[in-house]
A protein has these predicted regions:
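Active-site PLP attachment segment
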Residues: 204, 212-244
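Conserved N-terminal alpha-helix of the aminotransferase class I/II PLP-enzyme fold
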Residues: 44, 51-92
Length: 376
């Protein structure tokens, strides 16, 4: 136990010791973009499911007795909604990404990934057997160059391209049209993590890769714990890939299946996304307002999305700014290494339907004042 004490003490000395904190103030921190996590329609769907006997827990792995009608119904509905051949429901986005990256790329393959992909992708790649190469953020040309160099070096396997469609800490968007063309030219597989776009962006909230769904070389991941307000993740892919995951993915095979009640919740969230487009429209109006106001009052160029990073560089300043905003009643968290690269500590402002323009304007006023008064 001493080594754990020593490591925690070292984190404390560097002011990087983390602790859980309560949910306080106006929500500018969560990923509940459409405010579905406690939506009345979601509640009614869950109550109705309980009344008709849907169980709390799955009772086992999907390959044993844990495969429930609700899982299969969700996967069928999700495949139709996203426009893919098949979908597979995992317990979390982390588990799904780990499953994909640890299993699918083979020893002779190459994975070219954006340097800012999620930690779960990195863990999956470390557990996998393929060669993995990072490229500069949003640099499609570097992706093409990396695959060409690998082929010139004698690479014979499958090339894989891994990106997020909307990046969780920067709020910017991957150049998917260019990447899709590069994937086609190299007969590469394109893996797109839609975690922060699902339900919010793309045609009908289907994500930013919606135009490419259904292609044999696309695998997309849609998390269910952000805009969909529930838990889990849906992997969308050709039937062959889904069948391979069912048969070979250890995180899928050896884990208790997600609660059937959560499958019901995700299914209801997808239906709400379809029948209530005004939620997305309201959010996009708030996004446009906040981006304009942030530029006008703080001199900070907005990301254009619902994720607004305020990059201040130093860790101490980021955490002081966060504390000031929290004291004023705004739940905004400071983000620092190792979550983001060294020298890019920031505030991560997330816009959700839990706030309106009035609250957002007041928050930006407080932020502008804090930026002026707190030393750089």
């Amino acid at each position: 136990m001493q080594r754990y004490e020593q490591e925690l003490a070292a984190l404390a000395r560097r002011d990087r010791l983390r602790a859980l904190s309560p949910r306080l103030g106006a929500d500018f921190s969560s990923n509940d973009y459409l405010a579905l996590s406690d939506d009345p329609d979601m509640r009614r769907a869950l109550v109705a499911a309980l009344e008709r006997g849907v169980p709390f827990g799955a009772g086992g792995s999907r390959l044993l007795r844990g495969n429930h009608e609700e899982h299969e119904k969700l996967e069928t509905e999700a495949a139709a909604f996203f426009g893919t051949e098949r979908a597979l429901y995992f317990g979390s986005g982390y588990m799904a990404n780990f499953a994909l990256f640890s299993l699918l790329p083979q020893p002779d393959d190459l994975v070219v990934y954006d340097e800012l992909v999620h930690a779960s992708c990195h863990e999956g790649m470390r557990a996998g057997r393929a060669r993995c190469v990072a490229v500069a953020h949003r640099d499609a040309g570097a992706v093409d160059d990396a695959i060409r160099a690998w082929r010139c070096d004698g690479g014979k396997g499958q090339a894989w391209i891994a990106v997020e469609s909307l990046y969780s800490m920067d709020g910017d968007i991957a150049p998917l049209a260019e990447l899709a063309a590069i994937a086609e030219s190299h007969q590469a597989m394109l893996m797109v993590d839609e975690a922060h776009a699902t339900g919010v962006l793309g045609l009908g909230g289907r994500g930013l890769a919606a135009d490419y769904e259904g292609r044999d070389n696309l695998i997309s991941l849609h998390t269910c714990g952000k805009a969909l307000g529930a838990v889990g993740a849906l992997v969308c892919a050709p039937k062959l890939v889904i069948d391979f995951l069912i048969n070979r993915s250890r995180p899928f095979i050896f884990a208790t299946a997600p609660p059937p009640l959560m499958a019901v919740a995700v299914g209801e969230a997808l239906r709400i996304v379809q029948r209530q487009p005004e939620r997305r429209e309201r959010l996009q109006r708030l996004v446009a307002f906040a981006n304009r106001e942030l530029a006008a009052r703080c001199g900070i160029a907005g990301s254009g999305s619902q994720i607004l990073p305020v990059i201040v560089g130093g860790e101490a300043r980021a955490m002081s700014l966060a504390a000031t905003l929290q004291a004023a009643g705004y739940d905004i968290r400071g983000i620092r290494p190792p979550t983001v690269p060294e020298g890019s500590s920031r505030l991560r402002i997330a816009l959700t339907l839990r706030v309106d323009e009035t609250t957002t304007s007041a928050m930006i006023d407080t932020l502008a004042e804090a930026l002026e008064t707190l030393p750089a």
